[in-house]
Amino acid sequence: MKKIIAIVLVCICVLGIVGCSQQPQQVQGGLLLAEGNVINIDVSSLPEGYNYSFSGADAKAIIDYLSTLNLESNFEENPNEYDGMTWVISLKYENGDALTIYHFGNMFIRVKGGSCYKMTYDEASRFDTLLDELK
């Protein structure tokens, strides 16, 4: 009887450890965006220094970039521990709504007031390349 209880306790412990560990969950960047037609995108930096405005095909290129990101919702890193410049991406929709996205630390992105997601360094650096092409 003691063996059975010991085995059950070990199984419960193993299941608890496996079930409680944070497994990376992949999500698409499109979840960051609201439904609707974007008419303008302003991109600025924190600290201040850069300020761009895009519409038409250039705005679509930024939306395509954001939509195709492969994001991770569970990660070990603490975004608050990463320094560096933050891109502030402000989308203006045809219906008057606005959405602000923060792209920072060369690996994190979040919607204002929303959850933080992790992306690969390669995906994050693609935004800098895209801005260089569009400006």
Regions of interest found by a model, annotated:
Residues 20-135:
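Function-determining sites in protein domains
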